[in-house]
Design a protein with these regions (language model features):
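Core catalytic DNA strand-manipulation module of type IA topoisomerases
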Residues: 12-13, 34, 39, 62-66
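Extended, well-ordered alpha-helical scaffold/bundle regions in very large, multi-domain proteins
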Residues: 20, 33-44, 48
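Accessory beta->alpha helical hairpin/"wing" motif in late/C-terminal subdomains of nucleic-acid enzymes
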Residues: 2-35
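Acidic, serine/threonine- and proline-rich low-complexity intrinsically disordered segments
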Residues: 1-2, 41-169
Length: 169
């Protein structure tokens, strides 16, 4: 707020409905997603939603995503420290477990190829992808400069088994 007026950052935050809404908004405000491709944006945003079942070293698609993830972790760390100082916890820790899968699926790879060497079930994959699509829609509405890339990522992710099982998962 600026007095009684909601700031641009506040308006943008009001369009994000996720557990890590503040970390997502700060990621957007800091321009972390601005120079990424559509699928790189999806890969990075997946860390705010996914929860790995077992600890594995995650695969990171490329250096652009890796650099963005470092920036996001720095943002999350600042928020986490601030929350710790005030005895609150609203931001879940980023989880890189879906980055590679989102990147490969969005890149047009088949389901068997994407899930190879993963312990994720098809249902969990569809659910995670649908959640990512929902977040991409929110980000598209929150920052107009990211709208085109987010909508492009959605088209690339919302296909095949995701469409077929989307209403069931």
């Amino acid at each position: 707020l600026d007095g009684d007026t909601v700031t641009a950052s506040g308006k943008m935050l009001s369009k994000i409905y996720a557990e890590s809404d503040l970390a997502i908004a700060e990621t957007i405000n800091n321009g972390v997603l601005d120079k990424l491709s559509d699928i790189e944006i999806a890969s990075v945003l997946s860390i705010f939603l996914f929860e790995s079942r077992k600890p594995e070293a995650p695969k990171i698609p490329n250096t652009q995503v890796q650099d963005a993830l470092k920036d996001v972790v720095a943002i999350w760390s600042k928020l986490h420290n601030l929350e710790s100082e005030h005895d609150v916890k609203t931001q879940k820790e980023p989880d890189f477990g879906f980055c590679w899968l989102a990147f490969r699926w969005g890149g047009g790879h088949g389901l068997n190829s994407v899930l190879k060497n993963s312990d994720l079930t098809v249902g969990d994959f569809v659910r995670s992808t649908k959640q990512l699509i929902d977040l991409l829609n929110q980000v598209a509405g929150a920052k107009s400069e990211l709208r085109e890339k987010c909508m492009s990522a959605i088209k690339k992710l919302d296909r095949g088994v995701v469409v077929y099982l989307g209403g069931v998962a």
